[in-house]
Amino acid sequence: MNAINNQVLIEVKDLHSAFGNTIIHRGVSFSVHKGEVMAILGGSGSGKSTLLRCMILLNRPTKGEVLLFGEDIWKLKEREQQKIFNRCGICFQFGALYSSLTVLENVGVMLEQYGAYSKKIVEEISKMWIEKVGLPPRAYHLYPYELSGGMKKRVGIARAMATNPEILFLDEPTSGLDPYSAGKFDELIMTLKESLQLTVVMITHDLDSVYDCVDRFIMLKDGLLEFNGDLKDFIKKAQTQGLDEGNLFNSTRGEKFWKGM
């Protein structure tokens, strides 16, 4: 893995969140550096998805700060928020593809929203990214219902990357994929990171992904940050202090991770 830059791109400070009377987070703090692949782990209901949503303006925290590129996103005006998120790509768990659009049209959606590109340029950039994520030219004119789960994930990545983001947010990127496809997806993430110095934040239950392509991960439990470090740190803490890691994951992939233990 490439060396991680010292520049902090994301900083979460003392984040609290709740739904009604149900407390989700109680003072979560961490940072993400440029060029780092960081994962958010935790058991079902631990607040992984809510944390990600707080980081991408979908859930407002009840307290605390979320800084992207040094700006507290929840204190910015809408126009300034948009400028920040023009530098980010987001790929949701099921791709969130438009069913009435072809692969080529889906990938070009964000470029068209920028309004600064001609139709020809949008098409050329879209084709480039479709091929970069490992899909053949014959996929250009397919519709989402004609794609496998793995292909949909790759289209989602192509669309998120088409605007050349500095940060990529991923929600369960290998969920629903067979082991081979999940492994190839991990390779894609590493290729993007190494070739573009991309910073990636992902929610995952996939322990092989953690082993293969994650530089560091945080672990949520009972609304708190239970762990923040790399795999070596995790192994050391599990052996010396004990961690309830066995109950945190439901993925069938994890052989490499557990061998490390």
Task: Show the residue positions of the predicted features.
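Helix-to-loop junction immediately C-terminal to a conserved catalytic motif
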Residues: 56
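Conserved ABC ATPase "signature" region
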Residues: 120-138
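Conserved ABC ATPase signature
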Residues: 143-147, 151
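H-loop/switch region of ABC-family ATPase nucleotide-binding domains
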Residues: 204-205
